[in-house]
């Protein structure tokens, strides 16, 4: 949905050229195929208190390992770029940062990827993210 909105509404969040659209699609596909599922598994295991059991710790370790390959790719890109596409915040950053947020509770994973960690902090320091997060925290449990 986010890609559709960026594509139809335009603006700086969306692609400015066909090449940028291809890159947005590439990074979004990485987010939903290689990052989202293992990151959500880490979040869910931790949320259920599984990080305090050997089984849960094992599940977290397996899913962290699944994230290392896409994070290495992301780290390499972010070593030379401030953002994923066009050196500006786009829907690609939004999509991938949100999927990666699910794994932020892992105690050491992001420390292995300093450029990714810095990029994620930049994405989450945006006023729009801060407003969204405040609204989410204000929702009833």
Annotate each language-model stretch with its function:
Residues 1-68, 82:
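GST-like domain detector, emphasizing the conserved glutathione-binding G-site
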Residues 12, 61, 107-114:
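Structural helix-adjacent loops and short alpha-helical linkers that scaffold large soluble proteins
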Residues 134-141:
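Terminal-tail/helix-coil boundary detector
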Residues 11, 76-88, 127-132:
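Surface-exposed helix-capping loop/turn segments at secondary-structure junctions
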Residues 2, 6, 25-28, 71, ...:
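Non-transmembrane alpha-helical segments in soluble domains
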Residues 34, 38-43, 84-109, 117-123, ...:
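GST superfamily/GST-like fold recognition
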